[in-house]
Amino acid sequence: MLSRTQEYALRAAVFLGRSHGDGPLRTSELAKRTGIPRNYLSKILHQMVRRGLVDSERGRRGGVALSRDPAEVMLREIIAPFQPAHEPKRCVLGRPECSDEFPCGAHQSWKKIKERTEAFFETTSIADVMAETPLP
């Protein structure tokens, strides 16, 4: 359901949430601690900075930090920048025609799953995830 980029963005955001208030964290350290390839992480963080989700500081004491309190940042905000502009709607059973008007056998169930998943990302904050996730 999530792309690798979205998974990495969530992983980085949760880790930054844990260190919120401790000052900036170097990208190399964040990459090492989260297991995300450094170059890939840099591109993800660049997008997060552009969206105002992460603050970036240059220099010896520089690094990245979550821009807001983890309780105020919903997971949807983290994954949205990495959502394809036009996500093709494919039938889970592979039918060429599948819609609300012409549904396949799994259409309604799959639609409910997607709606619940979207609601989860809309209403769950980084702090919520941190509370249930052990440290890496």
For the regions a protein language model found, what residue spans apply to each?
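N-terminal helix-turn-helix DNA-binding core of bacterial DNA-binding proteins
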Residues: 2-4, 8-36, 55
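Short, hydrophobic-biased segments on the C-terminal half of alpha helices
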Residues: 13, 45-46
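Solvent-exposed interaction patches of small proteins and small membrane subunits
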Residues: 26-27, 65-67
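Alpha-helical residues within the helix-turn-helix
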Residues: 32, 49-50
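Key DNA-contact positions within bacterial/archaeal DNA-binding proteins
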Residues: 39
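Beta-hairpin "wing" of winged helix-turn-helix
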Residues: 51-66
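Non-DNA-binding regulatory cores of transcription-related proteins
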Residues: 67-136
